[in-house]
Design a protein with these regions (language model features):
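A structural supersecondary motif
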Residues: 112-116, 137-179
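Generic alpha-helical structural context detector
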Residues: 14-15, 133, 137, 146, ...
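A generic structural signal for short, solvent-exposed coil/turn residues
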Residues: 47, 92-94, 103-105, 150-152, ...
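His/Glu-based metal-binding/catalytic segments typifying zinc-dependent metallopeptidases
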Residues: 82-143
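Charge-rich, well-structured scaffold segments of protease-associated domains
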Residues: 1-83, 157-272
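Intrinsically disordered, low-complexity segments enriched in polar/charged residues with Gly/Pro
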Residues: 20, 42, 86-89, 133-135, ...
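Basic side chains
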Residues: 2, 98, 149-152, 210
């Protein structure tokens, strides 16, 4: 992994988001693995059903038959134990801009920016956030891709997104990233920051973004086992309805001005 630029960059991103202790560092050392008793791991596997848990099922059985099968084969204690608290990794705040550099001998640089927006999940802003992402930093028709790669040739890849939390306790995070040649770094970083803060306005690009998001919502299907996970994901965010309903309905009446106003409030002038 140390010889892979992408892996090194991924660890740098984890450090930038969480600090010295992150999900990426939650690993056993070689000494800990060597000294570990294998039977302890086997016992942990055997004891998993003694903790509180949910059973997810997708298949042809009726609820009656399924419950009969579970009662017959899923052996658990009469009283289940609470799940032990796991490690918590909080996003670092970004009150001032800080630059982290990880030297790596390569022909191109990876540059990313992370800003903790310090705002919790809000279903009311999800439609405009999704449309902003589609317009500004999404696919090949987005402002970032067109400006950084197609028009100026300053990056191999470029994207930007306001990433929504997966749980209510986490904040929204603004994340941007480019990969470019070493000799284009200064121009690429300068231009990238300029379009992030002074977002170009294009009615044509907005129409492509709106139509693209609308068409994707029209044709997207959540099927089979994904239905269960979509339901659980909604529950994790305190929701009991499919968020795509509001997303689809709300974006139909949105204009480029809505995107511009959102960008000024949520993105312009951020520290990373």
């Amino acid at each position: 992994a140390k010889l892979n630029q992408g892996q090194n960059f991924s660890r740098l991103m984890s450090f930038a988001m969480y600090g010295p202790k992150s999900p990426a560092t939650n690993l056993l050392t070689e000494a800990e693995l060597t000294n570990m008793n294998p039977q302890e791991l086997v016992d942990r596997i055997h004891n998993q059903n003694s903790y509180k848990h949910r059973i997810l099922y997708y298949g042809p059985s009726s609820s009656k038959d399924l419950l009969a099968t579970i009662n017959q084969y899923h052996q658990v204690p009469a009283v289940l134990k609470d799940i032990p608290a796991g490690n918590e990794y909080a996003y670092l705040e970004t009150p001032v801009t800080k630059v982290l550099v990880a030297p790596y001998d390569a022909k191109q640089i990876y540059m990313a920016q992370i800003s903790n927006l310090d705002k919790k999940y809000d279903p009311a802003i999800e439609p405009i956030r999704a449309l902003y992402d589609e317009y500004f930093g999404g696919g090949m028709n987005s402002i970032v891709f067109q400006e950084m790669r197609e028009t100026r040739g300053l990056a191999y890849s470029a994207w930007a997104s306001i990433m929504p939390p997966s749980y209510l306790k986490y904040p929204y995070v603004l994340r941007t990233q480019i990969a470019t040649q070493n000799d284009k770094m200064i121009d690429a970083v300068t231009t990238f920051n300029d379009i992030i803060n002074n977002m170009p306005e294009s009615e044509a690009a907005f129409k492509l973004a709106k139509d693209g998001l609308t068409n994707r919502l029209r044709t997207e299907r959540i099927i089979k086992g994904d239905i269960i996970w979509s339901y659980i994901n909604a529950q994790d965010l305190g929701q009991n309805v499919d968020p795509r309903i509001k997303l689809y309905n709300d974006i139909q009446n949105m204009s480029l001005k809505d995107i511009v106003d959102f960008q000024k409030q949520w993105v312009k002038g951020r520290t990373y």
